């Protein structure tokens, strides 16, 4: 396999007036993501989630993210020209956008804390707060302790992102230090 990098960021959907639910607009699911060139699209709670085909280089990584986001925008515009995606960490959703049972699904898979080795508590839908996040996927063949890789990512990615992301609401649900989901590829 060699070393590869991928990601699955989430974005909110908006119309001309406000942030809306992406349920029924995006298509695709965790079990059956919608294939597009360079990756996938799917609904995740009220958000749109993109996934990219794992990249071998930094250039490939950037190109694939840009490509899939462009296809998401085209898809949204084909439904309604006022629809677009918006990159922000959290939003308080109107009740009307939380009617679907899918809007109450949080944390499809358990995640763990690399520092403690313990499973993190699964977020519960207690308010209308929804948060956008995502994961960096790192694939490798090396016999390296996954938790040590995650700890290194905390230092190289996590600490700088704390300076960039000033949204305290998102941190209430996701994105704590050392959070990861074990995968067979790394």
Regions from the language model: what does each represent?
Residues 1-186:
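Phosphate/nucleotide-binding catalytic core
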């Amino acid at each position: 396999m060699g070393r590869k990098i991928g990601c699955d960021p989430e974005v909110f959907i908006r119309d001309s007036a406000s942030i809306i639910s992406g349920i029924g607009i995006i298509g695709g699911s965790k079990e059956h993501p919608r294939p597009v060139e360079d990756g996938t699209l799917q609904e995740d709670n009220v958000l749109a989630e993109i996934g990219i085909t794992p990249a071998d280089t930094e250039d490939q990584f950037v190109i694939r993210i840009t490509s899939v986001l462009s296809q998401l925008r085209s898809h949204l515009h084909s439904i309604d020209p006022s629809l677009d995606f918006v990159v922000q960490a959290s939003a308080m959703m109107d009740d009307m956008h939380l009617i679907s049972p899918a809007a109450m699904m949080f944390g499809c898979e358990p995640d763990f804390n690399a520092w403690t080795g313990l499973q993190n508590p699964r977020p519960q839908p207690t308010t209308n707060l929804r948060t956008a996040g995502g994961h960096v996927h790192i694939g490798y063949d090396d016999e390296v302790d996954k938790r040590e890789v995650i700890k290194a990512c905390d230092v190289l990615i996590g600490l700088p992102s704390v300076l960039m992301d000033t949204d305290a609401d998102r941190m209430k649900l996701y994105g704590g230090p050392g959070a990861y989901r074990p995968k067979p590829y790394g």
